[in-house]
Swiss-Prot record:
The name this protein goes by in its record: Glutamate--cysteine ligase
Catalytic activity: L-cysteine + L-glutamate + ATP = gamma-L-glutamyl-L-cysteine + ADP + phosphate + H(+)
UniProt keyword annotation of Nucleotide-binding present: yes
Gene Ontology CC terms, in alphabetical order: cytosol
E.C. no: 6.3.2.2
Length: 535
């Protein structure tokens, strides 16, 4: 390990956290995972059936819910100290869901199955309460603004936090004028800046969507190549078409680049976006000719979560509280990494070995020095990310660093050298060598592109002489067999079923007892709540 490659700033922080009395702080980091996946039929068509009642109420079940569509499930683990327990929890959720799916399957990759016409993709329904209706109308607005097809892309969100005591320890060594809460927020925003600089590396290592079903593009122009079969489009060196400009894109959001200089400027930019009318949306209005709601408002964003980003600063919200209100009131609590593809070779879409590397990577982003992003740096970060998702495995690919081209493999290897001492520290804290082993696995992918998930997807399709849909269905069937032959214990099954039953009762109680406020007034109050916040 070349210690001289580390900045003095990072070395100082690592030495502090590595002291015997402080090492246990790294055992207290929290890890949570959210995994989205489509329900499909045995013939790889979208399952347009309602969300299975046996899974509980999507509005109130904290572990099994829906994302955009009735057909798009979302599994949510609690935030746990041991990532092995987080992955195990995710695995148990899958096993419970499979016990209630009948003949349906969970779609294995991020990019969707062949989709029906947009009008036949069902929007997720959350019942008749005002908050349930608000979630439904918000999704109608997403359909209006971006189309339903884009909303059917699935991913993995990885939530990570350091314990507050770790931030308090680091604050003691720095000249920072604010209080502990401000320092923690300041530090998480600094983490996000570094994540923007280096997240291309995650796309190279874990991108797993180099191909898609041709129908996904709905006839739009593209530069993809046809191969494998008539319905498959791909790019030969792509790592993640999901995260490319083929995926989620928005003209309205094009000028919305929240400043990651500090929490105040970040929340201000989002507040402005949810309060600023956007002409094409104004022309449509909030209601159709029948008086039905079609979007919550005509602003750049209906709500702050509409802003699409690779990573978000987060704070757990109280009941009825909006995300920005929570951030302004109590500061940043954790980050949500949002750019991870689902690995179609893994039953849960993510492995413990991957989780251990992400921990070390995010911790590196947190502990390394993080200057403010200059305008050219923002531009380079975006173009580097786009280059890697579209052609990350291209031999000799160069990225831009400090306004100079640098070979991807050279930069990636240098980053690995800097992340290694953090992996070593995590191993010392946990009495293991698993983080260093994960570093070695990732370095092997840098040395040999054939080991990356994106290359393995294309190699498997080639070996089996199949297109995207046939490959994805085969993987989905393999995982279904795994989960169905590994059922939960009777007690675990009963616990999940009780949670599902309770969630249905909670939704019914909410609908029966909520204060009678007409929906228009409710939406108006919801909109006003964000305008009244003061930093």
């Amino acid at each position: 390990m070349k210690d001289y490659t580390l900045s003095e700033f990072l070395n100082r922080r690592l030495a502090l956290l590595g002291e015997r009395n402080n090492l246990s702080l790294l055992e207290q980091c929290l890890h949570g995972i959210e995994r989205e996946c489509l329900r499909v039929t045995a013939t790889a068509e979208l399952a347009c059936t309602p969300h299975p009642q046996a899974l509980g109420a999507a509005l109130t079940n904290g572990q099994v819910t829906t994302d955009y569509s009735e057909s798009l499930l979302e599994f949510i683990t609690p935030a746990l100290k041991n990532p092995a327990e987080t992955i195990d929890n995710l695995d148990r959720i899958h096993r419970f869901v499979y016990s209630k799916l009948g003949d349906e399957l969970l779609w294995s990759p991020s990019m969707p199955c062949p989709l029906p016409d947009e009008e036949h993709i069902p929007i997720a329904y959350y019942g008749t309460s005002n908050i349930g209706k608000l979630k439904y109308v918000y999704r109608k607005g997403l359909a209006l603004r971006y189309g339903k097809t884009m909303q059917c892309i699935a991913g993995i969100h990885y939530n990570f936090s350091l314990p507050e005591d770790a931030w308090a320890l680091l604050k003691q060594t720095e000249d920072f004028a604010g209080d502990a809460r401000d320092y923690q927020s300041h530090s998480y925003i600094a983490l996000i800046r570094n994540f923007r600089r280096y997240s291309w590396l995650l796309m190279y290592l874990f991108g797993a969507s180099p191909a898609l079903d041709a129908g996904f593009l709905r006839g739009r122009k593209h530069q993809l190549e046809q191969h494998f079969d008539a319905d498959t489009l791909y790019l030969p060196y792509a790592t993640s078409l999901r995260m490319s400009d083929l995926g989620y894109q928005s003209d309205a959001q094009a000028d919305l680049t929240p400043c990651y200089n500090d929490l105040v400027s970040y929340t201000d930019s989002l507040r402005k976006a949810v309060a600023t009318p956007y002409k094409p949306y104004v022309e449509v209005g909030t209601h159709d000719q029948n008086g039905e709601w079609v979007q919550l408002n005509t602003n750049v964003l209906q709500i702050e979560n509409e802003y699409y980003s690779n990573i978000r600063p987060k704070r757990v919200t109280y009941s009825g509280e909006r995300p920005i209100q929570a951030l302004v009131a109590r500061g940043v609590q954790y980050v949500e990494v949002r750019c991870l593809d689902i690995n179609p070779f893994l039953p849960t879409g993510i492995s413990l070995e991957q989780s251990r590397f992400i921990d070390a990577f995010v911790l590196y982003c947190a502990l390394e020095e993080s200057q403010q992003l200059a305008r050219h740096e923002c531009s380079n970060a975006s173009s580097n990310f786009l280059s890697v998702v579209k052609e990350g495995r291209r031999p000799g690919l160069s990225l831009m660093r400090d306004n100079r081209p640098v070979d991807l493999k050279i930069w990636a290897t240098e980053l690995m050298e800097k992340i290694t001492p953090i992996a070593r520290l995590l191993d010392q804290a946990q009495g293991t060598d698993e983080h260093l082993k994960s570093i070695a696995v990732q370095q092997a992918k840098i040395d040999d592109t054939a080991l990356t998930p994106s290359a393995q997807v294309l190699a498997s399709m080639e070996a089996h002489n199949e297109g995207f849909t046939a490959f994805s269905l085969r993987q989905s069937q393999v995982h279904a067999e795994y989960f169905r032959t590994h059922p939960l214990s009777a007690q675990e099954q009963a616990d999940f079923e009780a949670q599902a039953k309770t969630s249905i009762e909670e939704q019914a109680e909410l609908e029966a007892t909520e204060e009678v406020v007409d929906f228009d007034t409710f939406v108006g109050s919801y909109q006003a709540s964000i305008l009244s916040i003061s930093n």
